[in-house]
Amino acid sequence: MRDYYRVYANIDLDAIHENVVNAKKLTKPGTKLMAIIKADAYGHGAVEVAKTLDDVADAYGVAILEEGIELRQAGIQKPVLILGYTPKPLYPAMIQYDIATAVFTWEMAKEIDVEAAKLGKKAKVHIKLDTGMSRIGFRQDEESFEMICRIAKLENLSIEGCFTHFARMDETDKTWARKQFQRYESFVK
């Protein structure tokens, strides 16, 4: 019979901190940094990584509401953004825990606005643009622009930002990533 061994990872939080500090040095002064710590910080421990990066990260990005709630319950006060889809039944908890979500349809924005009004609060959202990932997000066209303008007028929403997801950033050839960035930049101007 073969011997089986448990696999484990030894996470060097100091190295993570140093990597983020060095990455931030490459940005322009005043640039804000959102640490993406979805999927338990990719298996590194979301709460531990968030606490380690508290002095360098301006916000945290997660995949689902439950990950954001875990951060809040661990005492993380900085802004948290759900990068993906948040189901309608979870809007009240999202608003109560002061967690922002990606918005990518008029209907979604309107439903969040209604829930925020019921709670007497403003819901925080970020506009998600689809520049080439082809999953979720507003396209760069006149119809989307008009919808985003309508969303901006909703009384119980606070639009905190706008973002996109680069489809092939890990590839050596950055042609597609540059094209996505140009689409993004062109639309938000």
Region locations from a protein language model:
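Conserved PLP-enzyme active-site core in the AAT-like
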Residues: 26
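Active-site-proximal beta-alpha core segment in soluble small-molecule metabolic enzymes
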Residues: 2-3, 7-10, 17-18, 31-189
